[in-house]
Amino acid sequence: MTYLLDANILIALCDELHAHHHDAHRWFKSIGRLSWATCPLTENAFIRITSKPTYPRSTGSVTEQMRVLRELCQIPGHQFWPDDVSLVRHEVWSSSDHASPADLTDLYLVALAVKREQKFATLDRTLPVHRIRGGQEALHLLGI
């Protein structure tokens, strides 16, 4: 099983002062590191969030955060998944009642994991994964 890591898990793994740093590391060491993935959206989110001057431990440098992520992605077991799911295709959704704009990115990531018959690992317990066909099965919540 391969786990597509949510940006918040990537951040927790790299930020020693993150509230979920130790839990994310424990999970990654025991399960996640065997086969894990990033994609353009999760990589972009990691770099965007951690390089913002408002992020508590930001270096303010996109280049530095790219280096941090590049080092993380050198850990064996990493895969890069290209973005190749379209949310405008009806077969992605479990109903015509689509999600709120705030959930679209994470639901896209769930759909990406579903397409590959893998898992989306996240800290977000409020994600309406039932809106994506196969979303419940693809969701892996970290036990935090």
Residue ranges of model-derived segments:
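Short, well-structured N-terminal submotif of metal-dependent ribonuclease cores
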Residues: 1-38, 50-67, 132
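Acidic, PIN/NYN-like endoribonuclease modules and their adjacent C-terminal/linker elements
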Residues: 2, 86-99, 110-144
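Conserved glycosyltransferase catalytic-site signature
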Residues: 7, 103-107, 124-125
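Acidic catalytic patch
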Residues: 16, 40-44, 66-98
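Conserved beta-strand segments of alpha/beta enzyme cores
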Residues: 35, 77-79, 137-140
